[in-house]
Structures are given as structure tokens and as C-alpha cells.
């Protein structure tokens, strides 16, 4: 899924049906933070790029991320530290489109297997939302607890406007992969 162009709220200006399109901060998807996080050596020790929608910056190391520069956007990109192992997921990333960028949202399987200590496979769906993620992720139980969805608004939007393009899976069934359970069709 690609979210392109801009994300805007259409706010009511008066009791009459007049509307004004206003950009949500960073809604054009042209500015990204590139977090460069080294995963644990026991799973390869590779440095991974974990992206966030916020003022352009590069952050090196496994620092916990907090929304920067007034950005209201959270993503499903995360850093996890489970049983002392640092692992990342990037399923939302910038993709060039025209003169700027769009947000590409992918769904993928993420696996971590370590010498009988950890054996996790999860379905990681790309998503963006207003809010934050509480890092680091420390397990797969109650993932909604790690999300703080929503941000305060002082206006009353009546609509959300955005461009998108989607490529659907060719699988007949959806799958469920939550971490410690068996992967099943749903």
C-alpha cells in the first residue's frame, strides 16, 4: 500500500457547508527520520534502517524513539528487545514518487530463531496512524498495549483525504501469525 501526495483533514469553517483543506503536519510524507539500528550479533548483527515520519534526520544506535518535531505520526516500524536480543521491523518506508516521497506500507513475515532461546515468527503489517509506539517492544502479548493511538486536535475535521495505491496478495486465505502460536489460515 502506498500513501501518496498528502494527508489532509477537511475542517468545517462555519455552520454553512464551507470546508477548507488543511495539511496534517508531515502529511505530504516528504520528511523521514532514518533510524540506523544494529541488531544483536546472535541474529546476524546487521544494521537495519527503521523509518519514522518526522523532520528529516538520521539517528544511529538503538535509542528508544519518541515522535520528533511535532510529527503526529506513528508507524508499525519498531525496535524490539526480547530475551536480550535486539531485533527491528520495518514495514513502512519512504518510496520516491514524482518530486517527493510517499509512504510504502508492506506486510511481511518477521522471524527470529536463536539456539532454542527464541523462536518467533510474526506477521508484520505496515501501518501509519496518529499516535506513538512505546519502545522497546518486549514481547508479543497484548500488542495494543504498546500503542498510544490518537493525538489531541483543536479543530473538528469532517473528513480525511489521501491518495493510495494497493497491490493485494494472491493468497486465497489470510494468515494469522502472532508470535508464539502456530501460523494458521483465517
Describe every region a protein language model picked out.
Residues 1-23:
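Bacterial Sec-dependent N-terminal signal peptides
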Residues 18-161, 176-179, 183-186:
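Aromatic (Trp/Tyr/Phe) and Gly/Pro-enriched flexible surface segments
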